[in-house]
Amino acid sequence: MTPEQKAKLEANRKLAIERLRKRGILSSDQLNRIESRNEPLKTRPLAVTSGSNRDDNAAAAVHVPNHNGQPSALANTNTNTTSLYGSGVVDGSKRDASVLDKRPTDRIRPSIRKQDYIEYDFATMQNLNGGYINPKDKLPNSDFTDDQEFESEFGSKKQKTLQDWKKEQLERKMLYENAPPPEHISKAPKCIECHINIEMDPVLHDVFKLQVCKQCSKEHPEKYALLTKTECKEDYFLTDPELNDEDLFHRLEKPNPHSGTFARMQLFVRCEVEAFAFKKWGGEEGLDEEWQRREEGKAHRREKKYEKKIKEMRLKTRAQEYTNRLREKKHGKAHIHHFSDPVDGGIDEDGYQIQRRRCTDCGLETEEIDI
């Protein structure tokens, strides 16, 4: 734009603002905001490094003219700017590159997450040799500085102290083996059935807390047989909340024999289940009475279901009979033809023999051709 066009544009802008001010459309705050918005941009120092540089930047900022050829308004605030920067205080509204560079990079949130695009980052992967050799297994105060040297020396063996190894072996022994034998055989616990054998069945002893040997557990299946959860519910009429209560019954869990994805199989010892069932139903007689009551209930429900089916069939038959009667009243009774013996009807134009039959009731005549 030429200087004449700029001057004309500025004059028109001032006239428009004056006209709006006279009409009372614009307030004083709005006028000040418009004036500050239309002022030329003020240059400011890019960075503050030292006292001499700040003075040079301030001096350079004083002599920068605006686009109208007039001195910038920043020259009027030279002293304020110099004192502000000289004191080392940076205004929060002014962006300082030196301050921004000092921000910690770990707090800056990336715009793109790497895990959304990279599933396997080979730069961060570690070679564990199929899971058999882990460099992290070495001790912190180990003499090996290189992981390859550690792997070549120990291989898949985890480096540990003698105390750690003894502690681990003791834990494995307590977990997978029975308790050590007593000091004297007379003090050893004996089987509660035979009172002779001191070697207990590990499953009954460790899981169900019963001092029974293997021979006695096989000779008395009516006491020490293992029952599934379904058998407990069907034979002793126990509910799921009762069987799931760990305070009432000991249980042995195994993988489901039907499928590995099914719920785990739970086994209960018969003597515990019987004792709780007798207490619940009032002894063996009460359990038999409950079984008889449930069998009678099953028979009653079966008979009730049969009667319901018979009733539905009768209603259906009655409705069909009623429909047939309405059809007979409207269209008459359905006629069934009774044809007479065939009579020779001659030969047709194609040379085939024709036989005629006639209904004895309505006189309907049909022709049959023997091909």
From Swiss-Prot:
Domain of life assignment: Eukaryota
Known outcome of mutating residue 207 to M: In RAD14-2; loss of recognition of cyclobutane pyrimidine dimers
Q: Where is the composition biased (Basic and acidic residues)?
A: 32-42
Molecular function in Gene Ontology: damaged DNA binding; zinc ion binding
Location in the cell reads:
Nucleus
For this UniProt record, give its keywords in alphabetical order, as a comma-separated list.
DNA damage, DNA repair, DNA-binding, Metal-binding, Nucleus, Zinc, Zinc-finger
Gene Ontology cellular component annotations, sorted alphabetically: nucleotide-excision repair factor 1 complex; nucleus
PROSITE patterns reported for this sequence = XPA_1, XPA_2
What other facts are recorded?
A: Present with 1030 molecules/cell in log phase SD medium.
Similarity annotation: Belongs to the XPA family.
**What does the function comment of this entry state?**
Involved in nucleotide excision repair. Binds specifically to damaged DNA. Required for the incision step.
Spell out the protein name for this chain: DNA repair protein RAD14
- Species of origin reads Saccharomyces cerevisiae (strain ATCC 204508 / S288c)
